[in-house]
UniProtKB/Swiss-Prot annotation:
InterPro entries in alphabetical order: DUF697, UPF0283
Protein name as it appears in the record: UPF0283 membrane protein ECA1987
Organism ancestry: Bacteria, Pseudomonadati, Pseudomonadota, Gammaproteobacteria, Enterobacterales
Record's bilayer topology term: Multi-pass membrane protein
Major place of residence: membrane
Membrane-crossing residue ranges in chain numbering: 70-90, 99-119, 213-233
Length: 347
């Protein structure tokens, strides 16, 4: 039963050396140079406004160049010279008792003073719009703050700007929910959930109504020029209403900042062929077959009006969006439903 022994196997003492991989130099990271990671949803990964609007905004944004500073300095010097010349002419007319020249100089001075006053009012309104952006940045900081007292004062200031007094039901619910242990972040979150939706609901209602009116008007209007004029008028009115809801009074220059997106709507209303092609892609084949070309154009114009309203809300709103940002798809479903009802009534 003894098995034969296997032959001996001799191994070399030195095994062949495998090539060692070359290691890269180590990298040291600290907390200051590291970038915090926060996961985002797929909807937030692609901005809803689109790259076209960002390109237009970048193109229309004024650039502070050397030539512009030289022009501003020249205008300021010319204004000072004109003011000095006016004072000298007024003095000479008074000394020489030239009453006709004195009356003309006085009238011109009143007109210039009115113009300067209008520019001062416009600058104040533009500063108010820029201040709203600073308030939004402050709100972002408070949402990450664990301090106390600042959040409540900030929210009470926003309520006064919006015209909400202490007797408003939303303000009373917010004040009843506050506790001494709440920090700034918790106070601001309560305000965003109890008080801010009062204004947001009104703004959404204005957007829905303007988008519906634009849709129906474009659908029945036979002239492209009428379409463009109607879209421009409705969009300007929508901007003014949204700004007034959030306690902002728009002037000429401050309205220009929000008017940039109106240009997209005007161009959209004039490009009828492009509207027809894009409108057919937005809807299902069954619904597109039942709609006319003008109805498809109306839905497209209504969607861009809704997008303009969402952008105006974002610029006029004092708080950043938490999880209640309006989506274009919500307004799209409303517009398609209204077009369906209109077609059914017309039969």
């Amino acid at each position: 039963m003894n098995e034969p022994l296997k032959p001996r196997v001799t191994f070399d003492d030195v095994s062949p050396q495998e090539p060692q991989p070359q290691l890269r130099a180590g990298l040291a990271f600290d907390e200051q140079s590291s970038t915090p990671f926060s996961p985002i949803s797929r909807e937030e990964e692609v901005p809803e406004e689109g790259a076209a609007e960002e390109a237009i905004s970048a193109a229309l944004r004024p650039k502070r160049s050397l030539w512009r500073r030289m022009v501003m300095a020249g205008v300021a010097l010319f204004g000072i010279s004109a003011l000095a010349q006016g004072v000298q002419s007024l003095h000479n007319a008074w000394v020489q008792q030239d009453w006709i020249a004195l009356g003309g100089i006085t009238a011109g001075s009143l007109i210039v003073a009115a113009g300067v006053g209008s520019l001062a009012v416009e600058w104040r309104r533009l500063y108010r719009l820029r201040e709203r952006a600073e308030e939004r940045d402050m709100a972002r900081d408070l949402l990450h703050s664990h301090g106390v007292e600042r959040g409540r004062e900030f929210c009470e200031k926003l309520a006064r700007q919006a015209g909400l007094d202490s007797g408003h039901p939303a303000i009373q619910r917010w004040q009843a929910s506050l506790h001494e242990t709440h920090n700034d972040r918790e106070v601001l979150e309560l305000y965003a959930r109890l008080v801010q939706p009062v204004l947001d609901t009104q703004a959404r209602r204005e957007i829905s109504r303007s988008a519906a009116e634009s849709t129906l008007m474009i659908a029945v209007s036979p002239l492209a020029l009428v379409d463009m004029a109607f879209i421009a008028w409705r969009n300007l009115r929508l901007i003014n209403r949204i700004a007034a809801l959030y306690g902002i009074e728009l002037g000429y220059f401050s309205r220009i900042r929000l008017f940039r997106l109106v240009l997209i709507n005007i161009a959209f209303a004039g490009a009828s062929e492009l509207v027809r092609e894009i409108g057919m892609d937005w809807m299902s084949q069954d619904l597109a077959a039942r709609l006319s070309t003008r109805a498809a154009q109306g839905i497209g114009a209504g969607l861009l009006t809704a997008r303009l309203g969402i952008k105006a809300m974002e610029l006029c709103r004092p708080l950043p969006w938490l999880d209640d940002k309006p989506r274009l798809g919500d307004f799209r479903r409303e517009l398609i439903g209204q077009v369906k009802e209109t077609l059914q009534k017309g039969r």
